[in-house]
């Protein structure tokens, strides 16, 4: 795809610290070495006029099981959070058994431990749908998925990194970040505050948040890199910039993000977006089946972490309101996909200047 660079992380035996290099060739801090190795990926010698369309491209070998393109593959964040979800289910089961055993002595514990289930006569549902997800709840789930990517990364201590996403070399805040924060996993609340700030300032939608997570996992798979404390902000920022332009189709310029993150500059944002696209092999397509899969898996993640919205019985007026929200979204999609009608020449009406004699 062109010039790119990765970073190999190894432990250092000496205790000396070295300052950062502007060219990103060598970094050592807190007894951790970072050595950037420049790599050149082969570029096909074909003209841009003969580049195939995204739908006509052949699937690259090894990407058939990519969850961001294959609707049958399980998302990566679900695999990373599997152990935590199982542990929480075991704790919840033990809690319910204790509540059942002490139900006579603590009558208030048992009702809270049980969940309402739908029946033939009553359906319990929240206000989030696949076409209109709940924004705040979706951002919480996205932040939790990013947290699991960082905390349960496979190559801990030997992370595969890329220079353009490293906050050591391309900081987005003027105040220097303490070195210990570059090696310590962030709290999911810090991730939520960072993502919420970008979404609220840029006025992005909940659908854009789901596409953001799809692009993050596609980047980690295509570039074969890891999400870690030193690069997660720039990875999330690049994914949000791309998702806001592709999915929402809004006139969001990169300079707008510089106004949100006032310590950044436009050149850095442009380079971040360009390199992000190169790592994705310019594959920005998200099928509807993949989008729906991520939506329902995020709901599963929310349920396992007690982040689900309060459910209420589905009565007639509420059902009509949810249907109206879905129809508005459906009409918007259908109207944009319909071809515009053209008038034939015989039905054209021309205006001629009147000649008064």
Curated annotation (Swiss-Prot):
Gene3D superfamilies: Cyclin-like. One of its GO terms (molecular function) is protein kinase binding. Residues 186-284 form the Cyclin N-terminal domain. Keywords: Cell cycle, Cell division, Cell projection, Cyclin, Cytoplasm, Neurogenesis, Transport. Residues 1-23 are annotated as: Disordered. Disruption phenotype: Abnormal localization of synaptic vesicle components and active zone proteins in the cell body and in the dentrite of DA9 motor neuron. In L4 mutants, incomplete elimination of ventral rab-3-positive synaptic vesicles and small reduction in the formation of dorsal rab-3-positive synaptic vesicles in DD motor neurons, although formation of ventral synapses at the L1 stage is normal. No other phenotype except a slightly smaller progeny size. Coiled coil: none annotated. This is Cyclin-Y. InterPro entries: Cyclin-like_dom, Cyclin-like_sf, Cyclin_N, Cyclin_Y. Belongs to the cyclin family. In association with pct-1, regulates the trafficking of synaptic vesicle precursors in DA motor neurons by promoting anterograde trafficking to the axon and preventing dynein-dependent trafficking to the dendrite. May also regulate synaptic vesicle trafficking in DD motor neurons and in RIA interneurons. Involved in synapse formation during DD motor neuron remodeling by disassembling ventral presynaptic structures. May activate cdk-5. It is found in: Cytoplasm; Cell projection, Dendrite; Cell projection, Axon. Interacts with pct-1; the interaction is required to activate pct-1.
């Amino acid at each position: 795809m062109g010039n790119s660079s990765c970073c190999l992380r190894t432990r250092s035996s000496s205790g000396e610290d070295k300052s950062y290099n502007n060219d990103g060739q060598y970094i050592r801090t807190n007894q951790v070495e970072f050595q950037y190795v420049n790599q050149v990926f082969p570029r096909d010698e074909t003209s841009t006029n003969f580049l195939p369309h995204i739908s006509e491209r052949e699937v690259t070998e090894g990407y058939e099981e990519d969850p961001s393109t294959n609707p049958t593959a399980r998302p990566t964040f679900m695999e990373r959070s599997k152990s935590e979800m199982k542990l929480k289910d075991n704790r919840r089961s033990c809690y319910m058994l204790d509540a059942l055993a002490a139900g006579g002595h603590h009558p208030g514990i048992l009702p809270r431990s049980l969940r309402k289930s739908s029946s033939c006569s009553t359906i319990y549902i929240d206000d989030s749908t696949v076409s209109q997800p709940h924004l705040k709840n979706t951002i919480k789930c996205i932040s939790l998925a990013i947290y699991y990517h960082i905390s349960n990364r496979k190559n801990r201590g030997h992370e595969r990194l890329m220079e353009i996403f490293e906050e050591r070399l391309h900081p987005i805040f003027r105040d220097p970040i303490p070195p210990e924060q570059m090696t310590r996993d962030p709290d999911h609340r810090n991730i939520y505050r960072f993502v919420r700030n970008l979404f609220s300032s840029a006025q992005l939608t909940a659908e854009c948040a789901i596409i953001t997570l799809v692009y993050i996992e596609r980047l980690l798979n295509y570039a074969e890199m890891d999400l870690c404390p030193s690069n997660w902000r720039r990875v999330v920022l690049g994914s949000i910039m791309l998702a806001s332009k592709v999915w929402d189709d809004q006139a969001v310029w990169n300079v707008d993000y510089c106004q949100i993150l006032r310590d950044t500059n436009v050149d850095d944002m442009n380079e971040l977006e360009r390199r992000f696209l190169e790592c994705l092999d310019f594959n920005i397509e998200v099928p509807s089946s993949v989008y729906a899969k991520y939506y329902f898996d995020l709901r599963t993640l929310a349920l396992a972490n007690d982040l689900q919205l309060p459910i209420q019985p589905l009565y007639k007026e509420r059902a009509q309101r949810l249907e109206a929200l879905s129809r508005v979204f459906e009409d918007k999609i259908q109207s944009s996909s319909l071809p515009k009608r053209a008038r034939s020449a015989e039905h054209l009406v021309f205006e001629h200047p009147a000649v008064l004699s």
